[in-house]
A protein has these predicted regions:
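Short runs within selected transmembrane alpha-helices of multi-pass transporters and secretion channels
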Residues: 62, 131-150, 157-168, 190-206, ...
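Short alpha-helical transmembrane segments in multi-pass integral membrane proteins
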Residues: 1-15, 69-136, 182-239, 295-360, ...
Length: 442
């Protein structure tokens, strides 16, 4: 095995497994809650849509942390790497508090934005109030994981996720259905299981982080002031990502609101496909993380030729992997939707939606690697903001509204049309990649 493949595997495989395990949090909840009927499926799905905003926002903080830590590690500047971690943790704590206040204090108002079904609102409010407390441990896990990957300890977040998923599965079984003497709690039981699992995940990552520091002989530095860059430069990197990711996730919520107004059956069909979509993307997300770390380190060393070469290899690997995974999804889409105790028409709609997703999967994965890893590794995040904003609000949302309210299409047609904006993203990203203007050493 070449040095390139060893480095890629060391980062990509643990990150991929971790992403798939994290996606399984949602799958386990959905399948078990699916035994309780369509209303509860939709309620948990709507929480997932709202939490997507937090996930992408805190993910953007973790992305900037990864960009800086990778480059400063490549440049052998430990102080700046620690400063990057400290500032990112502070940002993560502030964002977590804001989302906790929103989801924990105003769940009914949030749910009314998604659906007019009072049953879904009632079930969703119960779920929101409990799981809202998971935001802080999620932020801690995300940012510490960025450090561990850049320091070649990507296996730590994976093992933490494995323990958390095991806990989530067991607690779901006990609390949702009332096994081994526990009272059945339904959707609230799933919420408790998810919260406890996220707390366990962050605790295990924190312990692993401490062990790795000791093994590496590294000592924490509490600086909050950069020497190589300014806080304004940090803000200049994080704000475009925050804005673009927030607008993208807001767009996802607009799309979900459109799905919700297409009827409960359509919303349930879309919701039951979300976990498997997350799992498929997670199966190849390690390549995006590896691209950010590997290319970022090369840029930190000012080895621009090696950075471009590694980026191309990772893109090719992602394309081959996406085609293979998409083919499997087409074959087993019906088997997956059959796991849910819902009406046959909901299962049929879900199967077709998964096939449409599979057709777009190679484009989605290449966008993930390019936009989420390669192009951002140089720190110029503004161009990604422009691409994402135009793609979501200039193409995706208008097409979604046109298909749903203008053409009166069903869920399959609406989803298929709006997803064409992924093609625009890829075309523009490839042009920027080939021009090499993204290759910047901080």
């Amino acid at each position: 095995m070449s040095d390139f493949m060893k480095s890629l595997s060391k980062i990509a495989i643990p990150v991929t497994l971790q992403s798939m395990l994290q996606a399984s949090f949602s799958i386990i909840d959905q399948i078990m809650i699916g035994q309780l009927g369509e209303v509860n499926i939709a309620a948990v799905g709507l929480y997932g849509n709202f939490s997507l905003i937090f996930s992408v926002v805190i993910g953007s903080v973790g992305t900037v942390a990864g960009i800086l830590i990778a480059q400063f590690t490549g440049a052998d500047n430990e102080r700046e790497a620690w400063c990057s971690l400290n500032v990112s943790l502070l940002c993560g704590a502030l964002l977590s508090a804001l989302f906790l206040l929103a989801a924990g204090g105003f769940p009914a108002q949030i749910l009314q934005l998604y659906t007019a079904d009072g049953r879904i609102q009632q079930a969703g409010a119960v779920y929101f109030k409990t799981v809202a407390f998971a935001y802080l441990p999620m932020a801690l896990s995300t940012i510490l994981s960025a450090w561990l990957r850049c320091k070649e300890h990507a296996a730590v977040p994976f093992w933490a996720s494995l323990g958390a998923v095991a806990a989530n599965t067991g607690l779901n079984y006990l609390r949702i259905f009332g096994k081994l003497g526990f009272a059945p709690m339904g959707v609230q039981g799933a919420a408790i299981a998810t919260l406890v699992s996220q707390l366990l995940n962050s605790l295990l990552i924190l312990l692993g982080f401490a062990v790795c520091l000791r093994r590496d002989g590294s000592h924490p530095q509490w600086a909050l002031h950069f020497e190589r860059i300014t806080l304004w430069a940090y803000g200049g990197m994080i704000l475009p990502i925050l804005l673009s990711e927030f607008l993208w996730s807001l767009g996802q919520n607009v799309e979900s609101a459109v799905y919700g107004h297409l009827g409960t059956a359509n919303l349930a069909a879309y919701t039951l496909t979300c976990p498997i979509q997350s799992l498929i993307v997670g199966a190849l997300s390690g390549l995006s993380a590896a691209a950010g770390v590997m290319v970022g380190k090369q840029l930190g060393k000012k080895a621009f030729g090696d950075a471009y070469r590694d980026a191309r290899r990772i893109m090719l690997t992602g394309l081959v992997g996406a085609i293979g995974v998409a083919s499997l999804l087409v074959l087993f889409a019906g088997a997956y939707t059959g796991l849910y105790r819902v009406d046959a028409d909901v299962q049929a709609l879900g199967k077709v939606l998964l096939v449409v997703f599979a057709l777009y999967a190679p484009v989605k994965v290449e966008n993930m690697i390019l936009s989420g890893g390669i192009l951002r590794s140089g720190g110029n995040t503004r161009v990604i903001m422009i691409i994402d904003t135009i793609g979501t609000w200039g193409i995706g949302i208008p097409l979604c509204l046109l298909a749903a309210y203008g053409l009166q299409w069903g869920i399959v047609g609406v989803y298929a049309l709006l997803t064409t904006e992924e093609i625009f993203r890829l075309a523009v990203s490839l042009v920027i990649f080939k021009r090499r203007s993204w290759m910047i050493s901080l």
